Swiss-Prot record:
Topology in the lipid bilayer: Peripheral membrane protein
Coiled-coil region(s): 95-132
Keyword Repressor: no
Superkingdom assignment: Bacteria
Family, as annotated: Belongs to the HflD family.
Cellular component annotations (GO), alphabetically ordered: cytoplasm; plasma membrane
Cellular compartments annotated: Cytoplasm; Cell inner membrane
Keyword annotations from UniProtKB, A to Z: Cell inner membrane, Cell membrane, Coiled coil, Cytoplasm, Membrane
Protein name per the record: High frequency lysogenization protein HflD homolog
Length: 209
């Protein structure tokens, strides 16, 4: 069956967007607020009509992720911030496979996300309450699956409990995108053997943003 590279590229951009937001939060203590909202909201919507609907129905909501994906696909550098982004992205993919292999963890994740949806009726998505709840899901359900993702950044920034919660909530969004990526036919071999196809598709989507 032919792969739908539009959906695959969107989901992959979702993973990359989370990786870029985590990097920005860890080094600078801040990140693009619209991209963060899109990524965090994707965790809540468990019954989307389409892949694009997971990310708010707008390709522009994944602009940072698409740019990050293109940078990763087209760089030969294995050093510095680029290598960091690649490590975060691949680590999220590995954790998703661990999650998929654990029926108990998947069930727990589903229940905890349902609880999140109920909390969203009373709190804003970016509120400390929701951030802490999302971070708690990552710590309780995803981290024990291992291997843990080592986040690099400014020690002063990473000491902040609020930043720690945002980073973990954003990693949870990355897991959500990685689950979606597998669901629409994504796989790590594509990063080696379908780079040109992914690059072309990402450029086409970016042109619409």
């Amino acid at each position: 069956m032919a792969k739908n590279f539009y959906d695959i590229t969107l989901a992959l951009a979702g993973i990359c967007q989370s990786a870029r937001l985590v990097q920005s939060l860890a080094h600078e203590g801040t990140c693009d607020s619209e991209a963060l909202h899109v990524s965090l909201k994707s965790v809540i919507d468990q019954n989307p009509a389409s892949t694009l609907d997971v990310f708010g129905g707008r390709e522009a909501g994944l602009k940072i992720g698409l740019e990050t994906l293109l940078g990763m696909l087209n760089t030969s550098s294995r050093q510095g911030l680029g290598a960091e982004l690649t490590r975060y992205t691949l680590s999220l993919m590995v954790l998703e496979r661990k999650l998929a292999a654990s029926k108990g963890a998947m069930n727990t994740l589903g229940n905890r996300i349902a609880d999140l949806s109920r909390q969203l009726e009373h709190f804003e998505l970016e509120s400390d309450t929701l951030m802490s709840a999302m971070a708690g899901i990552y710590v309780d359900v995803i981290s024990p699956l291992g291997p843990r993702i080592q986040v690099n950044g400014s020690p002063n920034v990473l000491q902040s409990p609020q930043i720690q919660a945002k980073v973990r909530a954003t990693l949870l969004a990355g897991i959500r995108a990685a689950v979606l990526w597998q669901q629409v036919g994504g796989g790590r071999l594509q990063l080696m053997f379908s780079r040109n196809r992914l690059t072309t598709q990402a450029k086409q989507i970016l042109a619409q943003c």
